[in-house]
UniProtKB/Swiss-Prot annotation:
Protein encoded by which gene: engB
InterPro entries referenced in this protein's UniProt entry, alphabetically: G_ENGB_dom, GTP-bd, GTP-bd_ribosome_bio_YsxC, P-loop_NTPase
Source organism: Rhodopseudomonas palustris (strain ATCC BAA-98 / CGA009)
HAMAP family per the UniProt record, alphabetical: GTPase_EngB (MF_00321)
GO CC terms in record: cytosol
Residues covered by the EngB-type G domain: 37-214
Sorted UniProt keywords: Cell cycle, Cell division, GTP-binding, Magnesium, Metal-binding, Nucleotide-binding, Septation
Purpose of the protein: Necessary for normal cell division and for the maintenance of normal septation.
GO biological process, one term: division septum assembly
Protein name (database record): Probable GTP-binding protein EngB
Residues involved in Mg(2+) binding: 52, 74
CDD domains: YihA_EngB
One term of GO molecular function: metal ion binding
Length: 216
C-alpha cells in the first residue's frame, strides 16, 4: 500500500505531533479566513468519514477536533496550529455529501471550499478521506474534479481500515490508485489509516514532514 518510509521522517513526525496542538480559528465564510502564515494541510471528506477523529489521532488529543454523530454538523473551516517551530496548520473542512442539508447550505459550503482551495497560497495539500469500507463514491469524484480544476495537490486516505479485511482493503487501495490515474492533481499513493488503532498515523505524519521539507 505504501513504500517503506524513511525512519527519520517517522521520528520527526512523531515529535512534531507530540507537541502542543490547539484550535486557533473558525471560518464560516471566505471573508473570515485567518491571515496566511504557516503551511496549511487540509482534510476533506464526506460527512462522518472521520476527519475530526483522524485529526485527534494524529495529534494524540482526544478532544482537539470535535467529533459529531450528526452528519454535516461541521459547517466551517476549522484551523489548528502546532508548536511554534512546526510551521504547520491543520484545516478541518466541512463535510460534503450529506443529503439532508438544504440546497442553500450546500451552496454556501461549496462556495467556501472552492474559494479556499483556489486562493490559499499557503495550502500545501488536501488529504481527501474516503471510508475504507466503501471506497470512492460519485460525490467523492466530484470533489476530486474540483481539486483538479483548482490545481491543488491532494492525496487519498482510506479511513476505518480496522473495519475492513486485509484482502478487501488491498483490493480497495488498488482500485483507488487506478481511479486516480484520471486525476492530474492527485498524488498517486494511497494511505490507509485507523483512528481507533492508530494504524497508518506514523506514515501520515511522515508524509506531512516530507511536504514541509519541500515547502522550505
Amino acid at each position: 500500500m505504501t513504500d517503506a518510509i524513511d525512519p527519520d521522517l517517522i521520528e520527526r513526525g512523531r515529535k512534531m505531533f507530540a507537541g502542543d496542538w490547539h484550535f486557533i480559528w473558525a471560518s464560516p465564510s471566505i471573508e473570515t479566513l485567518p491571515p496566511m502564515g504557516s503551511v496549511e494541510i487540509a482534510f476533506a471528506g464526506r460527512s462522518n468519514v472521520g476527519k475530526s477523529s483522524l485529526i485527534n489521532a494524529l495529534t494524540g488529543r482526544n478532544a482537539l477536533a470535535r467529533t459529531s454523530h450528526t452528519p454535516g454538523r461541521t459547517q466551517e473551516l476549522i484551523f489548528f496550529e502546532g508548536p511554534p517551530n512546526a510551521g504547520l496548520r491543520l484545516v478541518d473542512m466541512p463535510g460534503y455529501g450529506y443529503a439532508a442539508a438544504s440546497k442553500a447550505k450546500v451552496a454556501s459550503w461549496t462556495s467556501l471550499i472552492h474559494h479556499f482551495l483556489q486562493g490559499r497560497a499557503t495550502l500545501a495539500r488536501v488529504y481527501v478521506l474516503i471510508d475504507g469500507r466503501h471506497g470512492l463514491k460519485d460525490v467523492d469524484l466530484d470533489i476530486l474534479k474540483t481539486l483538479d480544476k483548482a490545481a491543488v495537490s491532494y492525496q487519498i486516505v482510506l479511513t476505518k481500515a480496522d473495519q475492513v479485511k486485509a484482502a478487501e482493503l488491498a483490493e480497495r487501495v488498488t482500485a483507488t490508485v487506478a481511479a486516480l490515474a484520471k486525476h492530474p492533481a492527485a498524488f498517486p499513493e494511497v494511505l490507509t489509516t485507523s483512528s481507533r488503532t492508530g494504524a497508518g498515523m506514523p506514515e501520515l505524519r511522515a508524509a506531512m514532514i516530507r511536504l514541509l521539507d519541500e515547502r522550505r
